[in-house]
Amino acid sequence: MTTAQDLLDQLAVIDAGSELAQARETRDAATRHAQGSYETIFSADDGVDFTLAERLLLAENVARWHGDSQLASHYAERLNALPDEGNTARLESALDHGERLSFKPASATAAHLQALQQAGWSLDAIVTLSQLIAFVSFQTRQLRSYRLIGGHSVENASDRKIAAGYWRHDGKTHSGRSAPKVFTQAELGWEPWIPSKKLEEFDAEQQAILARFGHTDSDYFRLLGRNLPVLEQRTLTDKGIFYTSGGLPRKEREIAATVASKINGCIYCASVHSRKASQLSKQTEDVQRLIDTAPGGILSEGQSPRWQVQIDFAAALSATPPTASSAHIARLREEGLSTLEIVDLAQSTAFFAWANRLMLTLGEPFDD
């Protein structure tokens, strides 16, 4: 893939030969598969009953909700080149879902997915719809961070610290299992609100893809496997962001994932990534302090200066719409972070705008 084919490179106006361009080249897998995810979601040749016009209209709205008018204009231009399909109750239900996933993903319930089904959305289309909304949430944060690193102006910039978000604490899942009420580093389970695809429903080639990524026995990944090409690109993007050498230490990438999960209210994701951060950093008490932050509390309080600036940036990037500013980048550089490390921090945070919105709105955690 050349930079001429890379949407984020174009919209963020990344100078060829700059440190940012070099960092993205170093993280080639993340760069290629973020673009691959975009191309796969917006090709609309995946056999799912979800038209390209519907996809582009949803993407335009999601990009605007997340404060990126340039990305919204990109999707609008693509949409305007297609015949008008009109507005339908089915589309209105999808827009409602998109707005919920954008602003209050932790408020989603099983009833919301039932409403989508009643409006005519198939199970495969619901998964693809959720992937699209979550992916555009990821795109907007990638673009914002690249623009900031490149010295460009951004919308809605603020130096105000972003507080921890709301989370569900009902104590019971939709199926009646015990659900966690607080953030924890303990291992949790997760159950879907709509049926995962059974393993025998995948053909041999598809089963091999699931097996290659270790997804065979996971209800979550077999649910996302209802659109396997998108899942494959998403998984490769994940690996390109988190499983690379050099740059930001892995423990701090896990901290970024935890911060995003605290902002979005995703107890399950935070349990996985806070536990990993503790294992790698040996700073279990500091990580616990982070996840113990109550709604409205400031996540960086009581942390080391290096972690404070990273947490503040990750929180600001995770807000909807994001508020991360040039001042955040300046403080990261004052703490000695290189451009590659800042890219790693930004991409780790941005990816959990995607991951949280799937985990929170397609199912829920249990602890029994």
What residues fall within each predicted segment?
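Hydrophobic alpha-helical segments
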Residues: 1-368
